[in-house]
Amino acid sequence: MSAATTADIDHYRTVLAGAFDDQVLEWTREAEARQRFPRELIEHLGARGVFSEKWCGGMLPDVGKLVELARALGRLSSAGIGVGVSLHDSAIAVLRRFGKSDYLRDICERAIAGQAVLCIGASEESGGSDLQIVRTEMSSRDGGFDIRGVKKFVSLSPIADHIMVVARSIDHDSASKHGNVALIAVPTSQASVQRPYAKVGAGPLDTAAVHIDTWVPADALVARAGTGLAAISWGLAHERMSIAGQIAASCQRAIGITLARMMTRRQFGRTLFEHQALRLRMADLQARVDLLQHGLNGIAAQGRLDLRAAAGVKVTAARLGEEVMSECMHIFGGAGYLVEETPLGRWWRDMKLARVGGGTDEVLWELVAAGMAADHGGYRSVVGASSA
């Protein structure tokens, strides 16, 4: 897949500018106050063409548009809203590539139009990110599949219509506890969504456990046993790229607002910005956020979704984002600690999700490590073949 042209990206930016209007800002403010995700926001973005324009090129994502949407979400400075929309879009990515039946295509098209909301049910209490040992079971019956299990962290499940469920097929080995991973779409109406969790941050991102004990038709199968990990990994790579883009934009907004504070707040006869230590600390953060933006642009220019690059840029962005929000909150001083006076405390709490959601730092570093290549020839040339 080729990278989007400048004209394509410019057009998509225009679409985003029209869609992310005052109504979206108001829904975001209300969502932060109510700690609930507004389904109408996804409906609005779908109706305004945000998803259809992004997916008009085919079954693979336009990475440039993926990054632009992520930046628009990041500028909202609401992790709950940003991650919620990107999870819906990541489920679309999975269906767009792997959903072959008319049933799945219909779900996908309705999700793109904003007429259906999607979520992903992967992690369980038993294994977290280790999806090889999922306990949710899938078995064939009557031209379809029985699905039984409990998913612990299913964001958007309280408002979603369909869950992309990671399950383990037990058709050929009922005692199996590892592997045979599949992916299947389950209507939320056929599952039991529990009470949403109280969380440290990202309040509007309604996240709950989901209990599943139902039957679905064969047409609901997204990825057969043995290919489910590949399918969900594709969706996770999409989500990781989005998280990185959201962080880049939210960090830039936080830095800009903090700089404004530094240029108006005076201590010891000078503005905070005139104090060299503070000014250079912010310059260091700005330089690294700029590098993150350039990295995202570089990945987008390749024109394809690269699983290893997505893992690397997400973990790097998450750790940088945590530092940026912490430093900005620090520079605000006591006001940064007052939740009714500034949003810095909320932004700081929200950013913690980035180091866990979509894969922890350690899981993502393992993906990066798996693709590293040793330079044996270079080693021999500088150290010598006989050295231990």
Swiss-Prot record:
It comes from the Bacteria. GO terms for biological process: fatty acid beta-oxidation using acyl-CoA dehydrogenase. Coiled coil: none annotated. Transmembrane segments: none annotated. Pathway: Siderophore biosynthesis; mycobactin biosynthesis. One of its GO terms (molecular function) is flavin adenine dinucleotide binding. Its cofactor is FAD. One of its GO terms (cellular component) is cytoplasm. InterPro entries: Acyl-CoA_dehydrogenase (IPR050741), Acyl-CoA_Oxase/DH_mid-dom (IPR006091), Acyl-CoA_Oxase/DH_mid-dom_sf (IPR046373), AcylCo_DH-like_C (IPR036250), AcylCo_DH/oxidase_C (IPR009075), AcylCoA_DH/ox_N (IPR013786), AcylCoA_DH/ox_N_sf (IPR037069), AcylCoA_DH/oxidase_NM_dom_sf (IPR009100). Keywords: FAD, Flavoprotein, Oxidoreductase. Its EC number is 1.3.99.-. Gene3D superfamilies: Acyl-CoA dehydrogenase/oxidase, N-terminal domain, Butyryl-CoA Dehydrogenase, subunit A, domain 2, Butyryl-CoA Dehydrogenase, subunit A, domain 3. Belongs to the acyl-CoA dehydrogenase family. Catalyzes the dehydrogenation at the alpha-beta position of ACP-bound acyl chains. This results in the introduction of a double bond in the lipidic chain, which is further transferred to the epsilon-amino group of lysine residue in the mycobactin core by MbtK. This is Acyl-[acyl-carrier-protein] dehydrogenase MbtN.
